[in-house]
Amino acid sequence: MTRIKRGYIARRRRKKISLFASSFRGAHSRLTRTITQQRIRALVSAHRDRDRKKRDFRRLWITRINAVIRGVGVSYSYSRLIHNLYKKQLLLNRKILAQIAISNRNCLYMISNEIRK
């Protein structure tokens, strides 16, 4: 069998994955086999958390709106506010409502009073 000279292909491949894992701690940034395993884990987590981030931000916006809107009245809540928004066909999404709730509560109170009529 003839000899195959691959040059620096393997070194280049290992260097590429070690650059990816250079910020990892311990053997996760030094040993090739553990680097590849941790790289797969990191990419899986990143893929999973891209969807989870959307979920978490939606929950945060809903919590912020609900916390502010409960100050309007005892029986008034987030779900009633959203229901009234849909009935009046106001196109305000949860992100915008949460920003209004944080920056200008009086504006959110005015919106809720207008749509309750």
Curated annotation (Swiss-Prot):
Q: Gene Ontology cellular component?
A: chloroplast; ribonucleoprotein complex; ribosome
tRNA-binding in keyword set: no
Q: Which Pfam families match?
A: Ribosomal_L20
Q: What does the record list as GO biological process?
A: ribosomal large subunit assembly; translation
Compartments where found: Plastid, Chloroplast
Domain of life of the source: Eukaryota
Q: List the SUPFAM superfamilies.
A: Ribosomal protein L20
From the UniProt record, which GO molecular function terms apply?
rRNA binding; structural constituent of ribosome
Q: What is its main location?
A: plastid
UniProt keyword DNA repair present: no
Q: What does this protein do?
A: Binds directly to 23S ribosomal RNA and is necessary for the in vitro assembly process of the 50S ribosomal subunit. It is not involved in the protein synthesizing functions of that subunit.
Designated name of the protein: Large ribosomal subunit protein bL20c
**Organism name:** Gossypium hirsutum
